[in-house]
Structure formats: C-alpha cells, structure tokens
C-alpha cells in the first residue's frame, strides 16, 4: 500500500507540474496582426512567423504580383493566441531577377534588446514585413506603448529551388516554371521588368510608421 501511495503521489505531482507549465505557457500567448508589402513583383510560396519549437505559426496575406508598393499594405492578417515570434520563414520567387529565395531567419538576433522589450510587454502587436529587390527583407514591430521599431533587416541569398518550389498546378522543371510564372503576369508588369522599373535600391529604407 505504501508503494501505491507513493506512485499516486508521484502521479499527482507530475499532473500539478504539467498544469503549472501549461498555465505559464498560456499566459505568454498574445494576439498580433501581420502586414506584408513588396517593392517588386513576387510569387510567394510561404511566409510565416514562428516561435521556437511550438506549433504556433503567424500567417501573412500574400502579395499580388500585379498590385504592390513599398510600405503600402492591406489587408492585415490576424493571428490569435500565439507565442511571441522569434523567427521568420520566407520562400518566394522574384520576377525581377528570376531567382528563388528561401531562408529561416532569427528575429531576436538582429536587435535583441528591442525584441526582448516587445516580447516582455505582452501587448497586441503588428508585425510589418517588407520585401525589397535583391533579397532584402525588413521586419518592424508596432504596439501602443513602444511605437514602431525595426526588429530585423537582412539580405537573403538566392537558392536553387527544390521540387516543391517548382510546383504550380503541376510539377515543372526550373526553366518551365519560370516561363509559366511570366505567362501568368500582365504585359505591363513584364514590360516594367524588362525596362528595370523595379530596380530601386530600398536596403536603407528603414524608416517606417504604421498608419492608423
């Protein structure tokens, strides 16, 4: 009987510990919205915010390759009851240079003090992601008490696409996929690309204010 009592006591202790951990984890959850704008026409395959090893994914509304402008975005995507993100996953095809980009980027390493302050505040945040030409990406965070701060700025390196990157309705090889992508945009966008209309350098365009 003593052994059974010890087993029951141990099980109860385990349940209590797990309940406390679950409560602490739930208390860290926040709501946030996301915005995405680009300076060039893109075919986005996947973009999301992530927190550690959790199953929390902060989603974005993907841009339209026909309608876009730097620092202009709508609508937003609402994400509910998630951990504060510490990384960003980006996968897209750039029409202007016909290159593929993919990377999982740490958010907290670029501006760790600001990242910690926004996370600690536990407020409703808006994450605004800008994707410029030549692989430049920038991520700002905005809330009521701290305003807007640049949390991430980095230049992604182009990568060779995998089979999953070359799938659009059906599987393509690399060249046929690129051809198909250009067949799906308007003549005006193709002409602008040919005339290097989207080659403006935005890597130093870090000032950003989220309009109410």
Regions flagged by a language model, labelled:
Residues 34-46:
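Structural motif
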Residues 48-94:
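Tryptophan-paired
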Residues 107-141:
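Low-complexity, Pro/Ser/Thr- and charge-rich linker/hinge segments at domain boundaries
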């Amino acid at each position: 009987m003593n052994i059974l009592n010890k087993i029951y006591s141990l099980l109860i202790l385990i349940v209590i510990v797990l309940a406390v951990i679950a409560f602490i984890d739930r208390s860290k959850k926040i709501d946030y919205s996301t915005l995405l704008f680009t300076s060039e026409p893109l075919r986005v395959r996947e973009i999301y915010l992530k927190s550690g090893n959790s199953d929390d994914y902060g989603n974005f509304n993907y841009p339209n390759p026909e309608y876009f402008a730097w620092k202009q975005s709508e609508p937003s995507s609402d994400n509910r009851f998630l951990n504060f993100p510490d990384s960003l996953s980006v996968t897209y095809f750039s029409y202007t240079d016909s290159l593929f980009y993919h990377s999982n980027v740490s958010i907290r390493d670029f501006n760790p003090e600001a990242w910690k302050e926004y996370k600690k505040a536990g407020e409703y945040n808006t994450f605004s992601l800008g994707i410029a030409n030549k692989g430049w990406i920038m991520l700002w965070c905005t809330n009521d008490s701290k305003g807007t701060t640049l949390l991430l700025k980095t230049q992604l390196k182009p990568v060779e696409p995998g089979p999953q990157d070359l799938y659009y309705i059906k599987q393509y090889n690399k060249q046929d996929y690129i051809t198909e992508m250009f067949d799906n945009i308007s003549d005006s966008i193709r002409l602008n690309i040919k005339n290097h209309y989207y080659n403006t350098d935005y890597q130093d365009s870090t000032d950003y204010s989220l309009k109410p």
